[in-house]
Amino acid sequence: MNHSIKKTYLVFTMLLGFILLAGCNGDNNNDNSNNDNNGVLLTSIAVTPATPSMPLGLKQQFTAMGTYSDGTSSDITNSATWSSDDSTVATINGSGLAMGVIPGSVAITASLIDSSSNEQSATTTLTITDATLTALAITPVNPSLAKGLTKQFMATGTYSDGTSPDVTTSVTWSSANTLVATVNASGLASGVAIGSSIITASLGSDETTTELNITDAILSSIALTPVEPSIAKGITQQFTAIGTYSDGISVDITASSNWSSADTLVATMNTSGAAKGVSIGSSIITADFQAQSATSLLTVTDASLTSIMLTPANPHIPKGNTLQLTATGIYSDGISVDITSSAIWSSADTLIATVNADGVVSGITSGSAIITATSAALSATTTVTVTDTTLTSIAVTPGNQTIVKGSNKQLTATGTYSDGSLANITASVTWSSADTLVATVNNSGLASGIETGSSLISASSGALSGSTNLTITGAALNSIVVSPTNLSLVKGMNKQFAATATYSDGSVADISTSVTWSSADTLVATIDVNGLANGKAAGSSLITATSGAQSNSTNLTVTDATLNSIDVTPINPSIIKNSSQNFVATGHYSDGSTTNITSTVMWSSADTLVATLNPNEQLNSGRATAIEVGSSVIQASLSGVFADTTLNVTAALPNNPLAPELGEVARFAMLASQAITTTSGSAIVDGDLGILDQARSYYAGFTPGVNAGEFDELTNGLSYAGDDSTPPYVVPVPYASMVAFINQSRTDLGIAYNFLAADPNPNAATQVCPIELGNLTLTRGVYKTAADVTLQTGTLTLDGEGDPDSVFIFTIGGNLTSGAPGGDIVLINGAQAKNIYWRTAGKTVIGTNTNFSGNVFAWSEVNVRTGANVTGRLFAVTDQVTLDANAVTKAN
């Protein structure tokens, strides 16, 4: 639960040294705060939460996490460009906060173009349900509170679909008697005078109430815990103040007390009672409240190395390849330092894999070897698995690009191995440009346009190579667009502006770092050379971006709104040891506005032995790294207002199974040998249909669309059959004929089906699959049985345990049947339908009105009964797929 309390307190600033990360290939060290200046590029974006669902009327905060070419990550939520592909279903603002408009599903995309004209984006699906609010509940119920104290209320909504989300920040809070008690927009009530008041939470036409009694009890004494603790420098110690009142009731008054440290050079205190060791020594910690006080002596010792983290964790490399491991030392003062070059590296089995003094692992022969990094009597291990595969081809992407002279393009080399697996080998290939007068390319695959013309960019490894053509244009700048437009900003806050250029050849590019930025009224707002604006005083100023004779402006309004409260999300998340969690801080201001203040607040972890904040000196990023199993309070504070949540760290997850390579079948929502039939009322979204061994006439029940291959029941997809003539039917690229495309699809379906029968899966031990899956919760793994399997007695819950890449494989020797009274599949903690595979040696029957998730590979028939909803894919290897008024959405 979040708590927000405003106080006057001293802000102690610390000078944090930026820790430089060593590059894998001997590049110059890069400071993450200057990525663009040092050639560090944005390589990917991850949007969380993944595929969320919420009832109409609520809001969903999305977070965008950027990963850079030097291996670092940072929260880019506030600088990314957010978009919804259907604003009639849901809208999203510039801070990633989405609001539903009507029931339906939309693609939410976060994109960012860095100063090298390198664009990355990520998309997730937001589902707005038509679930209606059936009940509201407030907790705690009918509490008592001493005058002058505060009480946090929580509102929980129960919806018609059975979900019960926390709606504390979505409801409207009110107090019937504000002379007795007040309540703010976050549900925090304050006792003003003796008496009682009805506290109401309302959402739409629904509301619920509870009674808050304010007593005249007076504070008799305060007790502090722990008593005389000792901590290492940099460690945070949480103190608790318990007040005993004249009526005999004891209350936690930690958040209401005024905290102080007698020697702030030794230890500092925040407003929530957390002390942080600054230097060696002792200081008296005092809590004051309502004329009472209590003290405790805090002793601070020197900082020490507390743990080592190795990345990547448990990697796989082909025989003959190398892999750079990184060792990060976590110190008690919260500093994370790259100790790769100073650690002592060793391999438990040098016949399988060796490791040099710089942490570079070489795969010698197939098998597994434990790699250890040791420093200061501490060590960390990871298991490197060497696979007996060889590189068969190299692909360079994106293909055939056109860029403007003077700009850059990041290229990626992907290797395909003899076992069909793919790997990003960008950093290990040799890059070259056929014409360096036109374009150059560095050893990280970053191509630069030098002069107009074209050049072949190649990536090679041994005798293998892949290439793409890069065209450099000398297009003229036609216009500039500044975004976001007509922004409102709270005084003291920052906002990143972007300038997008449109050239005479129709191309566009981010020129944010090459334009000249200006503010018409620098007393109201300033803006730096990179387009970062800062609100100085209430008023308006015109922000302008200029390049040559072209310019564009937008109005920036600065308000003097004050920060009322902070929300930290996600609330009380759980992650595994050695992983990370990105927190988002949202500020609620006195003018009713909300702003993403993730990069502005000060972040702290109450127990840095469990979790640290902002590793590698990514200042105020809100990124927590899990060090040990346990829990730690994560706090965000700004201007005397703070909020906290609890991060729970669990043990590392078991090995993740390898998923099959789908090849051409990945494009299909349904693929069948003999036929695909439906009754009226079916809807298929985001995937193609295919019949492998029969003519197009074996599609039954579908309504032909305007163009060849289209069905009215099929959205964002086409249907295919082996006898389709061309034209009017269009053969997918790169195939020369429809027959060739169908043959390849048949081959890829067989490969995936056979892979799912592998025992054991190359990356995880096979477990026995229960013959009844109802009322079970299963974690990732391979589940196998020779018998028939049913899902009928209840709901099957698949738990991703916080890893959105968790793979679930069910290999069934008979039939799979779901249906009443159970039959639903529920995905929690990051589990995704696209990573679930059902392989049956018989038929698969999906029960009436059930909700099914996963990719079905059935040897014979797939029968989806009336009203069932499927998120995944349906493949009938030798038979047909039968629908009956169903909704099928391909899992992407």
From Swiss-Prot:
Lipid anchor positions (S-diacylglycerol cysteine): 24
Lipid moiety-binding residues (N-palmitoyl cysteine): 24
BIG2 domain boundaries: 43-111, 134-205, 221-288, 306-386, 392-471, 478-558, 565-638
Residue spans crossing the bilayer: none
Pfam families attached to this UniProt entry: Big_2, Ice_binding
UniProt keyword GTP-binding, yes or no: no
UniProt main location, coarse: membrane
UniProt keyword terms in alphabetical order: Antifreeze protein, Cell outer membrane, Lipoprotein, Membrane, Palmitate, Signal
Motif interval(s): Ice-binding site motif (T-A/G-X-T/N): 866-869
GO cellular component: cell outer membrane
Entry membrane topology: Lipid-anchor
Location of this chain's protein in the cell: Cell outer membrane
InterPro entries referenced in this protein's UniProt entry, alphabetically: Big_2, Ice-bd_prot, Invasin/intimin_cell_adhesion
Top-level lineage group: Bacteria
Keyword Lipoprotein attached: yes
Residues making up the signal peptide according to the UniProt record: 1-23
Marked site positions, Ice-binding: 866
Protein's job: Ice-binding adhesion protein that adsorbs this bacterium onto ice to maintain a favorable position in its aquatic habitat. Inhibits growth of the ice crystals. Has high thermal hysteresis (TH) activity, which is the ability to lower the freezing point of an aqueous solution below its melting point. The TH activity of this protein is approximately 1.4 degrees Celsius at 25 uM and little below 2 degrees Celsius at 80 uM.
Protein family according to the UniProt entry: Belongs to the ice-binding protein family.
Name listed for the protein in its UniProt record: Ice-binding protein 1
